A protein has these predicted regions:
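Solvent-exposed loop and beta-edge segments used for protein-protein assembly and interaction
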Residues: 45-49, 105, 116-120
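Beta-strand-rich modules
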Residues: 112-136
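Bacterial N-terminal signal peptides that target proteins for export
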Residues: 1-8
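An aromatic-rich alpha-helical recognition segment common to small helix-rich domains
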Residues: 55, 69, 124-126
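C-terminal motif of bacterial Sec signal peptides marking the signal peptidase cleavage site
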Residues: 16-19
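Short coil/turn motifs at secondary-structure junctions
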Residues: 60, 74-76, 129-133, 145
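Recognizes extended acidic, P/S/T-rich segments that occur
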Residues: 65-117, 138
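Pro/Thr/Ser/Gly-rich low-complexity, intrinsically disordered linker/stalk tracts
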Residues: 21-63, 136-151
Length: 151
């Protein structure tokens, strides 16, 4: 009788442990093909202190959480960049959905902001932050924004 009860207990424990293994779950992971995007600059213009950029968001535009427009002044001082030097962004403008200057319509993104000295040349790039923190930011190439023409 005791052997029979031990056999039932062992069987129940084995079934319990086996049943737990069936429900093993993994943490969800981002599907790179569905959740990744790239940014491509289509057009940019400067007017005085302001810059307007039009970009294409290629891929999962719905995952674009925010953008950083990273920039540096071009000049001869030690805290300034130069054409041909490695790009070291010294300042950045953060824009998010709902902010003035951030307009996302489908896969078209328009950014507007006014922080520039109209007489200085700048180098800049745009970094798009993905809503899924496991995926890296998407960045454009580095571009030059010439000083505004005299008015």
């Amino acid at each position: 009788m005791r052997l029979w009860i031990n056999g039932i207990a062992v069987t129940l424990v084995a079934m319990l442990l086996g049943g737990c293994a069936i429900g093993v779950k993994k943490w969800p992971e981002a599907v790179k093909e569905e959740d990744r995007f790239e940014l491509r600059l289509l057009e940019g213009s400067r007017n005085g202190q302001c810059m307007t950029l039009r970009l294409a968001v290629e891929g999962a535009a719905n995952r674009l959480e925010s953008v950083l427009v990273q920039y540096e002044v071009v000049g001869d001082e030690s805290d300034e960049g130069c054409i041909g030097c490695p790009f070291i962004p010294r300042e950045a403008e953060l824009l998010q959905p709902g902010d003035e200057g951030f307009e996302l319509s489908g896969n078209d993104l328009t950014l507007s902001f006014c922080t520039f000295d109209p007489d200085r040349e700048y180098r800049f790039r745009v970094a798009g932050v993905n809503a899924l923190s496991s995926l890296p930011s998407a960045t454009t190439a580095v571009y030059v924004a010439d000083p505004s023409p005299s008015q």
